[in-house]
């Protein structure tokens, strides 16, 4: 018998602001087998979880994610545009999301957002963080950029 997995796209994004900690926690609480999330780099090279290259659609900020440090990104509200109820939600770091899922068997699909903007070193940083939390057996890495996946595979080989 095959086991079909329920992966919550950007967390429980139908009911909560996408790619936020509350959306990820609710996906876990609601019985999802895993989540899909999107990763980009901030100006100070922090791995941040946000789908769009710009802040405009999902936050009260404007401009490109890459043009802000993580501390600056924390000033933007990632929940209010979804609903006033979620005012105050922040753009999370990938590390904070991984910490949430270390002590369970949740599956993570990490999409490398490296096609419109080329974030040099994104793949290596993501792999090292996955390895730090011993999540190699529970992570799927995806990207629309086939070269990004190739680089990720090469990073894995250099560590093994």
Can you describe what each PLM-predicted range is?
Residues 1-160:
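Phosphate-group recognition and catalysis centered on beta-loop-alpha active-site segments
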């Amino acid at each position: 018998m095959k086991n079909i997995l329920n992966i919550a796209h950007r967390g429980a994004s139908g009911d909560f602001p996408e790619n936020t900690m509350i959306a990820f926690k609710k996906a876990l609480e609601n019985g999802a087998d895993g989540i899909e999330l999107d990763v980009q780099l901030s100006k100070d090279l922090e791995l941040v979880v946000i789908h769009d290259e710009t802040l405009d659609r999902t936050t009260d900020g404007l401009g490109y994610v890459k043009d802000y440090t993580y501390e600056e990104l924390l000033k933007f509200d990632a929940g209010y545009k979804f609903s006033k109820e979620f005012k105050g939600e922040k753009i999370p770091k990938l590390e904070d999301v991984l910490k949430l899922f270390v002590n369970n068997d949740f599956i993570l699909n990490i999409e490398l957002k490296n096609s419109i903007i080329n974030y040099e070193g994104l793949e290596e940083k993501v792999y090292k963080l996955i390895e730090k939390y011993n999540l190699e057996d529970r992570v799927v890495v995806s990207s629309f950029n086939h070269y990004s996946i190739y680089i990720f595979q090469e990073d894995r080989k250099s560590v093994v």
